[in-house]
Amino acid sequence: MKNEAEMQLDEKQENAVMAAVRNGIMILTGGPGTGKTTTINAMIEYFHSENMEIMLAAPTGRAAKRMTEATGWEAQTIHRLLEVNGNPEEDENPNRNGFARNADNPLETDVIIIDEMSMVDLPLMNALLTAIVPGTRLILVGDCNQLPSVGPGSILKDLIASECFPVVMLTRIFRQAQESDIVVNAHKINRGEPVLLDNKSRDFFFLKRQDPNVIISVLLTLIQKKLPKYVNAKPYDIQVLTPMRKGLLGVERLNSILQEYLNPPEPGKAEKEYGDHKFRVGDKVMQIKNNYQLEWEVCTKYGMTIDKGLGVFNGDMGIIKNINTYEETVTVEYDEQRQVKYPYAILDELELAYAITIHK
């Protein structure tokens, strides 16, 4: 539980908590730094005090991990919440949707809070709603100004525009968030105002270069030397974003260059060529389509399986841990130490992820 000093709410945050208490469904939205997480914590504290069962979830493993860290309560991916056990697109029973939790076997809880709703697509939202029984409170949280999901639908924005549900929009940027120029500039961009460019900023920098090759040179210096020293980050913790896939500064060329600099070939380091890609042990990779049949497992350092399940999803990122030429498999470790063995035949579901598109 958060202490009282941390849980002081402004009027809109209090309204959001009351809306969550009084309604079966409500939407909490707002930009970065507006106190969505603090409001979620206040909701959790109230429902917990009423001895109500609470489930927290988010669309991706990374978002679920952040939610866990921010609330102190265990959060999981929506796929894991629903216990994926097949491909929803191939399941002929509309009540199942490829998940163990469905209309015939609904979620047993009083409250469900979903964060990062802007990333939820239509099929996943349908599966979630199918598994919720009347009487369960559903709280949807997200930033409606973020890019919509990679899959079909713009769920959060459409639900807000429908005016069918209680919506609380947080607009006040709290003092701690105001110290971040990223947060300040995000709100300026949303308002159509020029951003602040200050060389003394702690977290927002603009380096103007014209020549693509010079840009790449600066990029490599930042990743290999400057940023690891400045923010104490490993090169693998640094994500390069670009708006395009093709071209001199597109994802494909950048990944090829970054791979050679950050994870060059070495004697004894296994690699596998697949089409235009070359995968190497130690590479940062991303799953680029939903695969509901892929098995994952979590093992101890002695190889004993302690958890396992199905499903790896579009946008999941991990590190190649092993390439077994005898088995013809590539093993990738994802968040929460989940390891997946990819047969060579489905390596088209992976791509290098040193650089990714902004939408991804």
What do these predicted regions represent?
Residues 1-31:
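Pre-Walker A segment
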Residues 2, 6-9, 14, 78-110:
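P-loop NTPase nucleotide-binding/switch module
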Residues 5, 121, 256-260, 264-360:
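Conserved nucleotide-binding/hydrolysis modules and their immediate coupling elements
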Residues 19, 27, 46, 50-52, ...:
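Conserved helicase motor core of SF1/SF2 NTP-dependent helicases
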Residues 35:
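Conserved glycine(s) of the Walker
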Residues 39, 43:
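Hydrophobic positions on the alpha1 helix immediately C-terminal to the Walker A/P-loop
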Residues 144-310:
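Conserved helicase motor core of P-loop NTPases
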